Amino acid sequence: MQGKINYKDITQKEMFNEIFKEYVKEEKQIDLGTCDQDSVHDLWRRFVKRWNDGKMKSKWYSLGKRISQPSYARLVGPSRPTLENLQDRRELQEQLNELRKLSRKSAFKSQAKRETELLDEILPKEPAGSKEAMQQKKKEKRAALKHYREASDNEEDLKETDLYGDRDSFQSRLKQKKQRSEFRASKREMERLERDQELRNKIEERNKKELETIEKLRELAKARLQGFSS
């Protein structure tokens, strides 16, 4: 089992700082940069307790084992790092970067799932089980996943709300989308009514012309009959 941490030891806190930050971000969805000093201290105390109780995932202990090695510990002091020290640090940084990437992907999937659920609640629904309903759900889900895949490709531009969700902002966008959808539906209905009215006008105009033609034929026939009888 990984050696225990003394949460009052400043040197150990500095050594485990990167793991601590990544653990809090991945496991608790908390960015230490947004926390005050008291909150950070409380999170560190909880982190140390869980670590010492052996209740963390093995990957955290694997990282801890690396930084606990003497070669890494010497990097904390003022002495000049050796090539071996730098290699250890690069390998540790690569592992931390991989953890960050996995954390982001997990956050993307969770947010996409939440947005899909909100879409199901807010958007007009086709009859349950219908082909249209299934297609609509797939379409909206693909759109949500596409948004977060694109965000994942531009990690440097990400904000915390992109990773962990701004529910009010998303609901506002959904409301606007629903309003646009309703407006388009209303516009289509108005256009349909106008087309129907135009068709009715054409039919009435054609019927009127046919009646006028029939009336003229009747008058012509009547005139011919009168000519025969005279």
UniProtKB/Swiss-Prot annotation:
Q: Where is the composition biased (Basic and acidic residues)?
A: 160-170, 179-195
Compositional bias annotation for Basic residues: 136-146
What's a single GO CC term here?
nucleus
Q: Where is this region: Disordered?
A: 118-195
> Which InterPro entries did the record assign?
SCI-1-like (IPR044688)
Report the leader peptide range: none
Q: What is this protein called?
A: Uncharacterized protein C297.06c
| Organism of provenance | Schizosaccharomyces pombe (strain 972 / ATCC 24843)
